[in-house]
Amino acid sequence: MGDAPLPPGSGKEFTQVQQQHNNYSNHQQQHAFASQYDMTQQQQPFGRGLSGPYNMGLMMHALPHPSYRPGQQQQHQYGSPPNTNGNAQPMPQAHGNNTMNSMPGPPQYYMQQQHGLPPQYYAQQMQGSQQQQQHQRGSMSPRANMALYQQPHTQGQQYYYPQGAQFPNHGPMPQNSMLAGPYPLASHMQHVDHRLAQRQVGDQRDVDNTEQSQPRVDGARFESQSNVVRGPPRKPRQSGHAIWIGNLPPQTDLMSLVYHVCKEAPGLESLFLISKSNCAFANFKDEEACISAQQKIHDSKFQTVRLVSRLRKSTVEGATGLTAPTGPAASAPQSNISQEVKGDALSVVTTTEDLIASSNVSSPKVTSPAPVETDRSAPQKEKYFILKSLTVEDLEQSIKTGIWATQAHNEKALNKAYETAESVYLIFSANKSGEYFGYARMTSQINEDPAAAVEFAPKAQAASDVALPKAIPTEANEYMPKGSIMDDSERGTIFWEADPPEDADGVDSNDTTTAAVADDTVSIKSCETGGPDSKVWGKPFQIEWLSVARLPFYRTRGIRNPWNSNREVKIARDGTELEPSVGRKLTGLFTSRGVGQLQQQPHPHHHHVMGGGMPMPGGMVHGYPPMYAQ
């Protein structure tokens, strides 16, 4: 006869359950989910629990959880709500024994069973907990990543019921997907906090090192100011027949655009690319070619866009100093303007406005009465001159020293003005600034002593000091003529121009714009050769700054100088003299603010060494009062 089932509460059944639990405790180190089981037991608070021979909570905890398999959905039995406790997980349905499905109630109820266990149960669980803590001290939890196992880990049938399709084969699992308890998360956060603390310490060390090395950076930056790019940027030859090309794609290649324009319309002489505004200016040899090119290039397909083209306007009225690289042709050239342009290194002071001024020969009609011209030879109380500076740094240095030096061809006019007039006012402007820097009064004659000469333009742009434009030749093809790329990246200029005819050398005597650009090219070449005229020396004289308040060119719109072909005052060269009434009107736009802030009196025993190496007194020349803020 088979053994009859034992009545409830018998000691034999309790002994059988205890033996099964002892076997399970000895084998739990090989159990794939031992760490999670021990963690669950550690996290259980002491509370109300049920103990008895039919308590299957311990067996239920040994079953695998659906979250240990990828893609497994959590299942809730008997309509129980999903688990909201981070420590307790819903138990899956097991097959093979109906007693496992006869436990109603939420899963949280069965997690609190530790308090009601017999002493021998509790001792074995404490032993497993200690082993689990030893494993947690290592780099990773025991058997935390099931993806390390090629085959599923199996246990004896006395501990696991046969599983159906509810638990598929193991697959690749996401990292840290098995550890849902707070202990691995806390351990991970400890490592993160440790790395974050190290990073903060490293950042603080970097800040300290930066503060210590800051004076060296400032010193290097101060030394690099001596290699300032001087002079205006190079510009292509201006034929007076130009079109504007817009809607260029970003980062347009210059030669790709030149090839496209030459293919669509022949007769291109130069193309100036403005990358910042995605546009370009193209010069053509005559008006007919210019009009034809505008019609063909407009709405033409370039790469992936449609280009927009317009004819260039034939006037420079209303310009604010930042003019386009192309301009209208000269209808009545002025010979006196072209004669002022010297073919030496001093021609680098020609500004953008100067080149446009040389082509704008036909002055617009003046609706208001023109100012009465004063005879320059007649004695005058006041004289006004426009002086150009290569850089703003030279002007700021002059504020500190009260010394200025001009070009040689201006010295005679300034000396004569100082002798005949009561006051000589000098209005300063830096190249490419689009504004007046300020104005000062001449307080001494120009020192004719050769020993006092200073090098106000150090070595006249020697190739070793500044970056000069790079000329890159280009070969001709079926559409494009032979030419060259002028890359002046230091000044933000790049353009292409066709080579001029060999018989004319690219200079037309009747085109003052072309002559000015040609002279500018000669000056750059003379700087490269480093000939005897490469050093530009100036003789110093004393000035008293009256205002360093900046005056933009647009504020002087409408003020014209009768002594400069009635052009606007902003269109002037270095040394241009203003008609006295115009000079008074222009200086009246300045204010006296800013002189006291920028003016710094040097120590009486301190001497400045000028560019030519000649020691100059730091203060004023003996016999002249020091400068004061007006």
Swiss-Prot record:
UniProt note: phenotype after gene disruption: Does not seem to affect growth nor conidiation. Displays milder disease lesions on rice leaves.
All copies of domain YTH, residue ranges: 382-590
Localization in the cell: Cytoplasm, P-body
Stored Pfam families: YTH
CDD domains: RRM_SF, YTH
Keywords associated with the record: Cytoplasm
GO cellular component: nucleoplasm; P-body
Source superkingdom: Eukaryota
Gene Ontology BP term (one): regulation of alternative mRNA splicing, via spliceosome
Compositional bias of kind Polar residues: 70-102
SUPFAM superfamilies according to UniProt: RNA-binding domain, RBD (SSF54928)
PANTHER family, sorted: YTH DOMAIN-CONTAINING PROTEIN 1 (PTHR12357:SF3), YTH YT521-B HOMOLOGY DOMAIN-CONTAINING (PTHR12357)
Name of the protein in its database record: YTH domain-containing family protein 1
Originating gene: YTH1
